[in-house]
């Protein structure tokens, strides 16, 4: 048995080839959605090895559905969502868009995602036309650039043996988003007593067209990757350790300035509070030259598991 285990793990290490471009193409198709009729869209889910549909996928698809009903040259500036039920990867998701308001400058939409006749997700979005006004931002943290950080895949190769078998497919899957972590800040690292702060560089794994919606939808997808794990850091909780069960409860996001999701962005996250089995997390997204382009906030359930 021991020999078989070593052989299997060794084979897994050899098979961890960077297939992220292929995964990105799958994500782009996943976010495209099928139009059923006016205000009604259908999306598919990809089995990523986890127990349920990835929340970032539903956020990105709901954003796409809403944007399809909005006048040209109006782009999402904020979204606020609740995860109501776990999504089933074996069934399509129906997105029903409610045209709440079409104003002179702003457009408001509500999207309900439905599976098996029940809502699994509810999101309100606001779209705004380009407008002149005052501008300021908080500066980006002074941290190493993406070339000086550790890739997601390199971290996984080192810790395959430590990832619980039931989580391996999920964590070793092909990812459409390239990620580079500061040493000791990956959600795969061994749990230690850490402050609830984290920084990760991320970008789409290939070139994208110039369509604003596609870049926003992909960043919305990526914003749910690892955000909740920030609140686990001070408590020695880790997916790699298998000592926590977690789920996103809600998600809010603001798009401040134009950006490209296929260029490096810094995702700086912090967790001001955790209580009553819920972790509260915030994220700021910067371009490589320090421009603040988006912000995200999420509260998530995190239950400690006894071994």
What are these regions (language model features)?
Residues 13-307:
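Terminal targeting signals and extreme-terminal segments of soluble enzymes
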């Amino acid at each position: 048995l021991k020999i078989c285990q070593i052989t299997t793990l060794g084979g897994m290490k050899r098979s961890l080839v960077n297939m992220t471009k292929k995964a990105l193409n799958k994500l782009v198709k996943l976010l495209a959605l099928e139009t059923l009729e006016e205000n009604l869209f259908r999306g598919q889910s990809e089995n990523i090895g986890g127990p349920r549909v990835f929340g970032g996928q539903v956020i990105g698809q709901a954003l796409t559905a809403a944007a399809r009903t909005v006048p040209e040259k109006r782009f999402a500036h904020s979204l606020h969502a609740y995860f109501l039920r776990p999504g089933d990867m074996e069934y399509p998701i129906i997105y029903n868009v409610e045209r709440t308001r079409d104003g002179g400058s702003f457009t408001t939409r509500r999207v309900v995602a439905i599976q098996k006749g029940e809502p699994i997700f509810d999101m309100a979005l606001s779209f705004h036309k380009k407008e002149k006004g005052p501008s300021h931002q908080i500066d980006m943290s002074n941290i190493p650039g993406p070339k000086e950080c550790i890739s997601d895949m390199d971290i996984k190769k080192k810790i395959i043996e430590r990832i619980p078998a039931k989580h391996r497919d999920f964590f070793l899957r092909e990812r459409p988003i390239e990620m580079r972590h500061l040493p000791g800040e990956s959600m795969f690292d061994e749990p230690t007593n850490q402050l609830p702060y984290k920084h990760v560089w991320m970008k789409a794994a290939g070139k994208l067209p110039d369509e604003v919606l596609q870049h926003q939808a992909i960043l919305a997808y990526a914003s749910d990757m690892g955000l909740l794990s920030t609140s686990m850091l001070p408590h020695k909780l880790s997916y790699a350790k298998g000592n926590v069960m977690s789920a996103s409860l809600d998600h809010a996001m603001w798009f401040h300035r134009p950006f490209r999701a296929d260029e490096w962005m810094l995702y700086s996250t912090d967790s001001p509070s955790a209580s009553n089995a819920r972790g509260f997390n915030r994220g700021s997204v910067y371009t490589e030259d320090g421009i603040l382009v988006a912000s995200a906030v999420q509260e998530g359930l995190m239950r400690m598991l006894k071994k």
